[in-house]
Amino acid sequence: MLKTISPLISPELLKVLAEMGHGDEIIFSDAHFPAHSMEPQVIRADGLLVSDLLQAIIPLFELDSYAPPLVMMAAVEGDTLDPEVERRYRNALSLQAPCPDIIRINRFAFYERAQKAFAIVITGERAKYGNILLKKGVTP
């Protein structure tokens, strides 16, 4: 156990966050995301909510300031988004600094980004469209 490191952050996740360089991307996915069929390394965080993990990592993680650092999946035509999901994520991410805008991209574009991500963290999140991509920035 380390001081000031949230116990929600596993040693494997801490290692991945440290190894990521600026511009690298990490996905925090809901429990239904097809992470194991994609290329990046997969980290399990079963039972944890995405918002809780975001709150735990944001003191350690600099978001990119040169490109949109937050991306979520847009609803498929005919589906609706639950605004509470994005609100929870924004609240968690704004604990250190104002939360940047979250952009939405279509499902297949999100899958393409996920295939190129540094890692995917599968959580116990069950909210529909509960996946979020974070782009790492340069630590000041």
UniProtKB/Swiss-Prot annotation:
Compartmental location: Cytoplasm
SUPFAM superfamilies given in the database record: RbsD-like (SSF102546)
Catalytic activity: alpha-L-fucose = beta-L-fucose
Record-listed E.C. numbers: 5.1.3.29
GO biological process: fucosylation; L-fucose metabolic process
Main location group: cytoplasm
UniProt entry keywords in alphabetical sequence: Carbohydrate metabolism, Cytoplasm, Fucose metabolism, Isomerase
Keyword Cytoplasm: yes
Family: Belongs to the RbsD / FucU family. FucU mutarotase subfamily.
Protein name as annotated: L-fucose mutarotase
Organism: Shigella flexneri
The organism's taxonomic lineage, starting at the top: Bacteria, Pseudomonadati, Pseudomonadota, Gammaproteobacteria, Enterobacterales
Name of encoding gene: fucU
